[in-house]
Structures are given as structure tokens and as C-alpha cells.
Regions:
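Short, flexible helix-loop junctions that flank or precede catalytic/ligand sites
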Residues: 1-192
Length: 192
């Protein structure tokens, strides 16, 4: 819940209501078959760093959970750090960020690295420490996923380098960046 008072006594209240549900399978996300195959091939690597970027509300977290569903097997240990946990999945170890209690993305990432993960998903790469830990984790044999609030893949690289990432380590770690937008679709009952 967010409230925003303004001059003149007008106040807006925004509520984000999250429905618990299953992740959407990759084949139902609306990717073209070619792009879906490329994503599946890229995220099937044993280690590296993969980002999903786009504006607020573009489905970044939904896409990441679809990817995790694709990779989720009984012998794969997957840890997620989310603010908040929006989609729950059986077999995932999901941790909710709680800034008031001092539980932030960087702290949780450090804990994950001691928990022998195969795959780590960080809901959002907000600061240099979190991004650095993601790069380090990917270079030490983990598959790491995260989101960025940027409008394009090239803009994501610029943002990460501006945060102070070492260009050589970052280049070694990066598997790919998926930039996405939600596109309005008419239902099948509509006619032009």
C-alpha cells in the first residue's frame, strides 16, 4: 500500500494486490518460438548471469518465474530473494526482503552463497553490492537471474557499468539480457 498526500487535500492510495498462483509456462508467455528457443538455450547453461529488463509492470518477475519453472527439477537447488514474494513455486527456497529487519538483497545473497545453490534469483539489482555479488556468484559456478528497471538491453549494460562493475568480469559473467514490454492484444472475438 502506498499513500501520496498532495496540496489541496487530495491523497492517492495505491494498493498492489497479488494473487498467489502458479508461474506461467515459458511457451505461454507470448514469445515467438525463435525467441523462446534462444531464451531456453541461454538459461540452460550451468552458470552465468541473466537479466530481464523493462519498465515497471512489464512482467519481469513473471518472466523470471517462468524461467525458473522451466529449470526447476528435484535435483536443482534454487534460491530466490524477492521484495515481496509474488509467485510461489514448489521446490524453490524463497526469501522475502525485509528492510526494516535489515534483510536486504545483498545480505540474502551472501547467505545464499553459503547454502550451496545451483540457481539464484534476485528480484531486483538495485545497488552495486547486489550486482557485484551476482557477478561473483555467476563466476564461481552459479546461474544467477535478476531484473533491472531499464528500457533496453544496451541501457542495462550502461547502467550496470555506471554502478561500478568491472567490465571484464561482467563480460565473462553475462549470459544475456531479455528486454521486454507488455503488448496489448485483442481477444479472438474482436474484428478489425
Amino acid at each position: 500500500v502506498a499513500t501520496i498526500p498532495s496540496a489541496g487535500g487530495v491523497e492517492d492510495v495505491v494498493m498492489r494486490i497479488l494473487a498467489a498462483g502458479e508461474p506461467i509456462p515459458l511457451e505461454k508467455l507470448g514469445l515467438t518460438p525463435h525467441n523462446r528457443e534462444r531464451v531456453e538455450k541461454t538459461v540452460s547453461k550451468p552458470y552465468g548471469l541473466f537479466y530481464v529488463c523493462g519498465p515497471t509492470g512489464s512482467g519481469k518477475t513473471t518472466t523470471l518465474h517462468s524461467i525458473l519453472k522451466f529449470l526447476n527439477t528435484p535435483d536443482t537447488k534454487i534460491w530466490t530473494a524477492e521484495d515481496p514474494v509474488e509467485i510461489t513455486q514448489k521446490g524453490l527456497r524463497q526469501v522475502q526482503i525485509n528492510k526494516k529487519a535489515g534483510i536486504d538483497f545483498a545480505l540474502v545473497m551472501r547467505a545464499f552463497l553459503r547454502a550451496d545453490p545451483d540457481i539464484i534469483m534476485v528480484g531486483e539489482s538495485r545497488d552495486k553490492e547486489t550486482v557485484s555479488m551476482g557477478v561473483e556468484a555467476s563466476l564461481t559456478g552459479h546461474l544467477v537471474f535478476s531484473t533491472l528497471h531499464t528500457n533496453s538491453a544496451p541501457e542495462s549494460i550502461v547502467r550496470l557499468l555506471d554502478m561500478g562493475m568491472d567490465p571484464f568480469n561482467f563480460a565473462d559473467a553475462l549470459l544475456g539480457i531479455l528486454a521486454q514490454r507488455l503488448a496489448k492484444r485483442l481477444c479472438d472475438c474482436k474484428q478489425a
